[in-house]
């Protein structure tokens, strides 16, 4: 499943032009990444993790097509229940088994959705920190 068009269309030249005059904030940069890429949902709500079937995705999970994360795959995205589909936060995971850390973007995630995501990462050898975007 993909979310394209409008805010989530693929407009990298538009993103470059919008920020050509100077530095951007963390949140503006995330808005630009999400706005300039298509969200591909490859693990829909209710699906099981491919390597750990005991883990069930209670929210849609996917990636930004055409982007690259630390694991050389697309930047991961959690899609929450807020229909406005705006960047609402970011999280960092630390996995001591894989010896890695990753950034994931939260789109449309409410406080309740963030609690669900925290539970998903609650394992003995991993840690998660969620940074919620303050409302203007």
Which sequence ranges carry the predicted segments?
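Hydrophobic N-terminal alpha-helices or hydrophobic patches in metabolic proteins across all domains
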Residues: 4-136
């Amino acid at each position: 499943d993909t979310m394209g068009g409008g805010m989530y269309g693929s407009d990298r030249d538009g993103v470059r032009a919008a920020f050509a005059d100077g530095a951007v904030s963390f949140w503006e940069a995330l808005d630009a990444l999400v706005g300039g890429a298509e969200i591909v949902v490859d693990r829909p709500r209710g699906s099981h993790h491919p390597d750990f079937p005991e883990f069930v995705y209670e929210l849609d999970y996917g990636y930004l097509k055409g982007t690259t994360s630390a694991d050389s795959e697309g930047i991961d995205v959690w899609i929450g229940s807020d229909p406005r589909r705006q960047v609402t936060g970011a999280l960092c995971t630390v996995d001591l088994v894989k010896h890695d850390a990753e950034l994931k973007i939260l789109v449309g995630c409410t406080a309740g959705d963030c609690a669900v995501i925290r539970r998903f990462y609650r394992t003995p050898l991993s840690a998660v920190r969620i940074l919620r975007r303050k409302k203007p």
